[in-house]
Amino acid sequence: MSSTELRRTALDATHRALGATMTDFAGWDMPLRYGSEREEHVAVRTRAGLFDLSHMGEITVTGPQAAELLNFALVGNIGTVKPGRARYTMICREDGGILDDLIVYRLEEAEYMVVANASNAQVVLDALTERAAGFDAEVRDDRDAYALLAVQGPESPGILASLTDADLDGLKYYAGLPGTVAGVPALIARTGYTGEDGFELFVKPEHAVGLWQALTGAGEAAGLIPCGLSCRDTLRLEAGMPLYGNELSTALTPFDAGLGRVVKFEKEGDFVGRAALTEAAERAASRPPRVLVGLVAEGRRVPRSGYRVVAGGEVIGEVTSGAPSPTLGRPIAMAYVDPAHAAPGTEGVGVDIRGSHEPYEVVALPFYKRQK
């Protein structure tokens, strides 16, 4: 795909004026970094960062049977989500393979917003549309209806509070409420993908530039800086958060990924993948699959996705994500490994980096957890 064919967000000119390095991400021309990705990472951990996430896929589901449709289409119990709250869940194939991981916001009694990963938005839209047959509910593609800005980091509550009258103190994690930010109508959600406190702001695209400028101005004294997708990846890696295409795929069920807790068998009615996921749960209980673990380098060489994890001359797993960790000061990775080598502190584990078996320490995820 040539750069002329890439989709651009409402903030594209802003990113270019800031000197951003742009990259093709799931068909979108997105900012990878503005300067030093390490500085952007540290800003989010210690102060605040501002992200353009307008490539994410918003899908609205409305109607008298919206909850019933989502309970059938997704593996979670969406009917128990109260208005103003959100839930992390997944959509699976009939064979249990993960199509995507999602956040579902209940906006009103009979209105939900499903937020899919950019790379899977069309797949999720098609699946929900197909699964809506027979339900009194409408599935609407709202990807062009929203721009999405995220303010993440310990200073984000104070920065946002200076621009809104919304009750941020009462806004819990995984909750969202309509409000006005810098005069702009927004859905204000206390969600994020960095391991820090923060907010995601869904607004009309025509309001994105003004809101970005207002947030930049309000955050200047607190040290807020614009941040690209590169540091977003290292932030989520430190926080032990899975990325679709790395830790999650159609080849894995939620139980294979260690995320069986998102599957709610107790909910009323059937749901797509129930039979296969029941078998997957039984398999995982009797013969645990490979386990997702953290790996911390003893040296300086950085592992990458697809590198083999080894022990005793045998391949025992595969790296799914790897990068230098600005917080730990050493390379880190997430990897699926055999259960026998998954316990934190397991000795003799290494990563095959271009023929050299580099020693790595097995640790529990996440690598980083913020102090609340």
Curated annotation (Swiss-Prot):
Its EC number is 2.1.2.10. It is an enzyme of class 2 (transferase). The keyword Cell membrane does not apply. It holds the Pfam family GCV_T_C. Gene3D superfamilies: Aminomethyltransferase beta-barrel domains, Aminomethyltransferase fragment, Probable tRNA modification gtpase trme, domain 1. The keyword Transferase applies. GO terms for biological process: glycine decarboxylation via glycine cleavage system. GO terms for molecular function: aminomethyltransferase activity; transaminase activity. Keywords: Aminotransferase, Transferase. It catalyses: N(6)-[(R)-S(8)-aminomethyldihydrolipoyl]-L-lysyl-[protein] + (6S)-5,6,7,8-tetrahydrofolate = N(6)-[(R)-dihydrolipoyl]-L-lysyl-[protein] + (6R)-5,10-methylene-5,6,7,8-tetrahydrofolate + NH4(+). InterPro entries: GCS_T (IPR006223), GCS_T_bac (IPR022903), GCST_C (IPR013977), GCV_T_N (IPR006222), GcvT/YgfZ/DmdA (IPR028896), GcvT/YgfZ_C (IPR029043), TrmE/GcvT_dom1 (IPR027266). GO terms for cellular component: cytosol; glycine cleavage complex. The glycine cleavage system is composed of four proteins: P, T, L and H. The glycine cleavage system catalyzes the degradation of glycine. Belongs to the GcvT family. This is Aminomethyltransferase. It comes from Streptomyces coelicolor (strain ATCC BAA-471 / A3(2) / M145). The gene is gcvT.
